[in-house]
Regions:
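N-terminal, polar/charged subdomain of small-to-medium soluble alpha/beta proteins
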Residues: 52-53
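Extracellular/periplasmic, surface-exposed regions of secreted and cell-surface proteins
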Residues: 1-46, 56-295
């Protein structure tokens, strides 16, 4: 009941739109834009109370607001071609991603009238605090893929992507990640003709590839300096000092302390994977027995 006037509001808008074009046979061009926007608002009251052995004469209000924006745009072109027993398709594209977050808060004590209509930070006369921050990052990607098969027996796929992230310094902002896979559908060979009643489909495959990970703090590469006044309860040592030379003076020039050492050599985490395997289907019963082994 005491918290009945506290408020928490959350608005979110998200969606995407795309354009799809087929200028010539076999060529498809698609562009997509997506947006995710959220806004949070919070207002909490602290009121005096006297309940049994518990009591407090403090009155205060805290207001918080946060805005989050995430958008994505990409453009991808694919082209398919089939000539005789040769069949292939190629894909090329790029993508941009951006995320931003802004937040701020205000706290105030000491109100003459204890009602929600009056208790805003500007109306208080007691202790006040304010805080806020912002963050964000950008990611740009270029990618391409080539698929080729001959007579549905010999299969090749090659992928290449290059990603750049604002989370890394100029030394390692971009990284390249290739992958390749090969397949041989043995069941399509002439020497397997006599086994078709038992082995409906048999394929061996091998793949090698690299992927990247940029999941670090947005500002991990920067040196960060902060001013610390040493206030609080209990008091803590800070970077400011009393310019008057007296304990408890009001002139406090602030110094700075480095809380994080920058490193422009931070780079993408790269994972390399190798895979070999075999897929098979038996007794010409699709869906009845389909299995595979891989390493």
């Amino acid at each position: 009941y005491d918290n009945r006037n506290n408020r928490y509001t959350y608005w979110r808008l998200f969606g995407d739109a795309y354009v799809n074009l087929n200028p010539v046979k076999g060529l498809n061009i698609r562009s997509t834009f997506g947006l995710d926007y959220a806004q949070k608002y919070q207002r909490n009251f602290t009121l005096p109370y006297n309940t049994g052995f518990l009591n407090s004469d403090k009155d205060a209000v805290e207001m918080k607001q946060e805005h989050f924006t995430k958008w994505m745009w990409n453009a991808v072109a694919t082209y398919e071609l089939e000539i005789g027993k040769h069949r292939g398709d190629v894909m090329a594209g790029m993508e941009l991603n951006r995320e931003d977050d802004i937040n701020f808060a205000a706290y105030r004590e000491g109100f003459a009238i204890l009602t929600p209509d009056y208790m805003y930070p500007s109306a208080g006369v007691g202790q006040s605090q304010a805080s806020g921050g912002a963050g964000g990052f950008s990611l740009v990607s270029f990618f391409g893929k080539l698929n080729y098969s001959y007579a549905d027996k010999y299969l090749l796929s090659f992928t290449l992507r290059r990603d750049g992230s604002s989370r890394f310094g100029s030394n390692n902002k971009y990284a390249t990640f290739p992958s390749v896979s090969l397949g041989w559908r043995i069941s399509q060979e002439a020497f397997m003709e006599k086994t078709k009643d038992v082995i409906d489909d048999l394929k061996i495959r091998a793949a090698w590839g690299q992927t990247g990970n940029q999941d670090i703090e947005n500002y991990a590469r920067y040196s960060i300096y902060e001013s610390k006044y040493g206030t609080g309860n209990p008091p803590t040592y800070g970077t400011s000092y009393d310019i008057t030379g007296s304990n408890g003076g009001s002139l406090l020039p602030s110094g700075f302390v480095r809380t994080q050492i920058g490193n422009d050599d931070i780079k993408w985490e790269t994972t390399t994977q190798t895979n070999v395997g075999m897929d098979f289907s038996l007794f010409n019963q699709p869906g009845w027995l389909l299995d595979g082994v891989e390493y």
